[in-house]
Amino acid sequence: MFEKLQDVLCYRFADVRLLETALTHSSYANERGTEIEHNERLEYLGDAVLELTVSEQLFTRFPEAREGQLTRMRARLVSKPSLAELARELKLDTYLLLGKGEESQGGRTRSSVLSDAFEAILGAIFLDGGYAAAGKTVLHVFSSRWPQGAEAARTKDAKSTLQELTQRLFKERPVYTLLGSSGPEHEKIFKVRLLLPDGRALETEGQSVKRAEQKAAGLALELLEGESA
């Protein structure tokens, strides 16, 4: 029954009953008796698996991104509308087990039902095959959804964004100074000082001068953007 869906998910269940439970809406279980499990507990688990996997991927893919930027990207990726769109692409609507009332009220196309089912499937994969298996499925189905182009560039180049902002606010550029380095040759840590045109300074460290400068620029952006908010 679920052969094609498992192919699409890039995962074969050892216990396919977990997948069936992930696709079972509470309305279906309620109409047929308490012995039938529905997907709400799996959805709870899958939500945590999804958030951790996406957080880990964004952290790795965008080493220069500030915490606020990572949070915004993650929020867009795991939002209910985004997950519902993904569920439709996977044709989860054709596999859902719904109660008659939910079916008649359009539950098969409802975004909340679809997004919950997708998260429940991740929870089911986690229970069946572990975190690595669930993470692999996330990477597979999200392969074309990671931030690209202008959005990715914004997260990577805090220095350019800061320069544009300081030019606009102060008509001057920030100044970066290398204060020194420490540690063994293969694990050097570089310390950088950033001086804003208004006289305020920030000091940061990084595994390269570039990373330290980007980190300083990111902190300065948060400072200046917070003041102008």
Curated annotation (Swiss-Prot):
It is an enzyme of class 3 (hydrolase). Transmembrane segments: none annotated. Its EC number is 3.1.26.3. Mg(2+) binds at residues 43, 116, 119. Residues 2-130 form the RNase III domain. Its main location: cytoplasm. It catalyses: Endonucleolytic cleavage to 5'-phosphomonoester. InterPro entries: dsRBD_dom, RNase_III, RNase_III_dom, RNase_III_sf. GO terms for molecular function: double-stranded RNA binding; metal ion binding; ribonuclease III activity; rRNA binding. Keywords: Cytoplasm, Endonuclease, Hydrolase, Magnesium, Metal-binding, mRNA processing, Nuclease, RNA-binding, rRNA processing, rRNA-binding, tRNA processing. The keyword Zinc does not apply. Its cofactor is Mg(2+). GO terms for cellular component: cytoplasm. Signal peptide: none annotated. Belongs to the ribonuclease III family. Homodimer. Digests double-stranded RNA. Involved in the processing of primary rRNA transcript to yield the immediate precursors to the large and small rRNAs (23S and 16S). Processes some mRNAs, and tRNAs when they are encoded in the rRNA operon. Processes pre-crRNA and tracrRNA of type II CRISPR loci if present in the organism. This is Ribonuclease 3.
